[in-house]
Amino acid sequence: MRYLTAGESHGPGLTTIIEGLPAGMPLLAEDVNKELKRRQGGHGRGARMRIEKDQVQITAGIRHGKTLGAPVAMFVENKDWKHWETVMSIEPVPEKNEKSRRVSRPRPGHADLVGGMKYGHNDMRNVLERSSARETTVRVAAGAVAKKLLHELGIEVAGHVLEIGGTRANLKRDYAVSEIQETSEASPVRCLDEVAAEEMMQKIDDAKKNGDTIGGIVEVVVGGVPAGLGSYVQWDKKLDAKIARAIVSINAFKGAEFGVGFEAARKPGSEVMDEILWSKEDGYTRRTNNLGGFEGGMTNGMPIVVRGVMKPIPTLYKPLQSVDIDSKETFNASVERSDSCAVPAASVVAEAVVAWEVAVAVLEKFDGDRFDTLKKHVEEHRNLTKEF
């Protein structure tokens, strides 16, 4: 299974096409729209979210509420397009049109300058329109489809915010996926710790007042995962590696870790490895989950636990120094409408990309042509691994 996305931040809209879904899987527009709505929430979002009320249009691949096995095409309209029709016109416009909003002062930390160099754009709007995090709208749409597939197979995905601006949630125990879903949805910053959430919101407000931005850490947990997804036989078949790549591919994300993550470097092996248990009711389990649900690049039946770190958004209302590409003189960087903190929304994007990679791994392991046979094969596999 694979997907492609297309579209610019202020263009007519965003498109994604998914290929490889099994036939007969239940899927409605509302399954996607509820995820799009979650992405638009969170304390610290900018004015754009008051304009865009994202709704998906499914234009191919589904009939009477079920997938056909053909490519599924989805489109999300940009409501703000009406204000950008000249700037983002498909047809040519006069080169010196006053509405062109040409960008010649690249923003530090963005794709602007290097993207302009790479593709020969002397107007870096050609770069920033595509590199914008607005593209994650349709990544969340694709992830919503993956989450629906996993849900039907008894696999659930939940994300939450662990840290913002140096304030970290004080979590004294592991949370079930259902608990994470319920508690994070009730929080303006998608945090499970109410005390930390209040401090996070204050830090976001302070950053906004100062024309600054802050980043943080999100965590995604996947429960009900069967053992044996991914493989150890080749480096590029390891599922944890694929998930790490997906996490770091999200705009502004700079790292990923599983389980205890980088803390493993500070602990002896006896405190890191997860002891193996067996019971007639549950089959093989682990006493702990320090490895985040992976051994040898494969799922081991424990929940997948992955975290991603997001840098502060590089668009600052108190802009940093840059250089004008025309005059080569020093100026303050260009300012585009942006958020002061997008970490809560990014947790929803992280859910989407993790769900996608797990769904792909499921379809790689089991028959993916028909959804009814897929469900049957997953259940048979669960029984086989339990009795091993």
Swiss-Prot record:
This reaction introduces a second double bond into the aromatic ring system. Homotetramer. It catalyses: 5-O-(1-carboxyvinyl)-3-phosphoshikimate = chorismate + phosphate. GO terms for biological process: amino acid biosynthetic process; aromatic amino acid family biosynthetic process; chorismate biosynthetic process. Reduced FMN (FMNH(2)). Coiled coil: none annotated. FMN binds at R130, S131, S132, N251, A252, G296, K311, P312, I313, P314, T315, R337. It is an enzyme of class 4 (lyase). Pathway: Metabolic intermediate biosynthesis; chorismate biosynthesis; chorismate from D-erythrose 4-phosphate and phosphoenolpyruvate: step 7/7. HAMAP family: Chorismate_synth. Residues 95-118 are annotated as: Disordered. It comes from the Bacteria. One of its GO terms (cellular component) is cytosol. InterPro entries: Chorismate_synth, Chorismate_synth_AroC_sf, Chorismate_synthase_CS. This is Chorismate synthase. The keyword tRNA processing does not apply. The keyword Flavoprotein applies.
